[in-house]
Amino acid sequence: MLALGKLLDLTLAGREPTEKIQLTADGTRLHWLAEGALEVTPIGARDNGVDLLLSAGIHGNETAPIELLERLIRKVAAGTLKPAARVLFLFGNPEAIRRGERYVEQDMNRLFNGRHEEGSGNEAFRAAELERLAQVFFSKTERVHLHYDLHTAIRGSKIEQFALYPWAEGRQHSRSELARLRDAGIEAVLLQNKPGITFSAYTYGQLGAEAFTLELGKARPFGENQEVNLERLERSLELLIDGSEEQPDGSRLDGLKLFSVSREVIKHSDHFRLHLDDDVANFTELSPGYLLAEDIGGTRWVVDEVGARIIFPNPRVKNGLRAGILVVPAKL
């Protein structure tokens, strides 16, 4: 197998490869662009016009998606997975991955869409670098641009595998992309309703890609992801990469749950209190009238939505950041 197929090993060791460009036996080109960044280009006769960006490790302790990308990279390098799509593999936060920590100084997935310009440190610099790499990768016109940013969550979930679909002015959510997610094992999709500051929000809103954040289970250390079943997603990504995927049928979205954002719970001060157990699962239902959170100045978040569920509850975020999202069932 080609040395560039060991991108994770290189990243964990903090090493640059001796050869930054290598070719497989059939002519597929592997190009190491930067730390944790590998571009795969198919031979011209096989290129099907798809540009697929796969990122993982924006949070360094979310290892199951990193291991998934590593398996795909090794298959490409060994010649057992023959790409028809251009693919950019990104391990987002190398230093946090090496430390096995969510982040070193700042939550990187709050630093996109220009937020990195307001910060400093390695994670702000890396967010800017990831934006640049994505911008260059998606600069070819008249091609299909698709981005999956793969994550696992801090806590368990009533719906284990779900996606967040960004929002941008004047764009409609794609039924065929939703069908593709369903076919890959994604059980639910949260349709967002305002611009975001995540990596997928950047590639969707600024670069025009179809882009999603995928939440794929609970975060665990390397080698301890046996309970995270990514077989359907891995197979779907292989079909996308080698060009043998059947066109998703977006006319029916049976089996896919859709949600929309009702409200975000923002932590304003150190007096913020979230009235949920630390181990409450994502997508836990909350009854109307439930006092969800309180903050300084008499600020109260009381559930008044029917069918409301909580996702990403985290009272430990910095002041001014989102400490949870209330979502409700939705339709297209």
Curated annotation (Swiss-Prot):
Zn(2+) binds at residues 59, 62, 151. The active site is at 215. It catalyses: N-succinyl-L-glutamate + H2O = L-glutamate + succinate. Its EC number is 3.5.1.96. It comes from the Bacteria. One of its GO terms (biological process) is arginine catabolic process to glutamate. Its cofactor is Zn(2+). Binds 1 zinc ion per subunit. Transmembrane segments: none annotated. Pathway: Amino-acid degradation; L-arginine degradation via AST pathway; L-glutamate and succinate from L-arginine: step 5/5. Keywords: Arginine metabolism, Hydrolase, Metal-binding, Zinc. One of its GO terms (molecular function) is zinc ion binding. PANTHER family: ASPARTOACYLASE, SUCCINYLGLUTAMATE DESUCCINYLASE. Transforms N(2)-succinylglutamate into succinate and glutamate. NCBIfam families: arg_catab_astE, PRK05324.1. HAMAP family: Arg_catab_AstE (MF_00767). Belongs to the AspA/AstE family. Succinylglutamate desuccinylase subfamily. This is Succinylglutamate desuccinylase.
